[in-house]
């Protein structure tokens, strides 16, 4: 009797295994099943680098800040504290960031109560074909977040690119259109507009080669030119 019971259990298990294999074969095998499970996973909106940097920013407790630079890789790569050695400087650049990414993390910047905040964002919005209206709406929301802050806000124009080096993923015609909208937005929101663009273009309307290696990011001379313009912001008006 016991032997028959054992045989029945073995037979039942084998039947279930065979049935399972049959179902998998009809649905495309293990790979298909894995793809179905993978399809249920929510794709991350932000890169691991973005999330890591955001977490680090939010963990630090620096106060009495003079200047905060906010932006994408062009900001991220800058050693701004070396250009302003007598001031407390924070770099809040994250490589590949967009206006939406900055909006998602801007509360940490607001909470620092810095004397001055310099925002440079937009080239990745252009590169990833974000509509200008969406971009400007994000900029408005970023600035609105500072409504109760005493920080002086500087919206900086998007820098030109050098298409002969970088290619045509971003055109300067598009940059100019975005910058025109940025300038108007800064005026409407009563914040400073720091127009970097004219100081960085050559006679052909391209990012000066002496300021870049890859056609979009800045080298040492480029950062020196940028920070020199920032140093003169006390003379700019809203």
Please identify what each model-predicted range represents.
Residues 35-141:
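Conserved SGNH/GDSL esterase-like catalytic core that processes O-acyl groups on lipids
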Residues 160-238:
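Catalytic His-Asp segment of secreted/periplasmic serine-dependent ester chemistry enzymes
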Residues 120, 156-157:
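Alpha/beta-hydrolase-fold catalytic nucleophile elbow
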Residues 115, 148-152, 191:
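A short helix->loop->beta-strand "cap" motif at the edges of active sites that frequently abuts
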Residues 70-72, 156, 194:
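Active-site flanking residues adjacent to catalytic metal/cofactor-binding acidic residues
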Residues 137, 141-148, 177-184:
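Alpha-helical scaffolding segments of alpha/beta enzyme cores, especially the outer helices
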Residues 85-87, 149, 189:
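Short, structured coil segments at secondary-structure junctions
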Residues 1-66, 235:
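N-terminal secretory targeting modules
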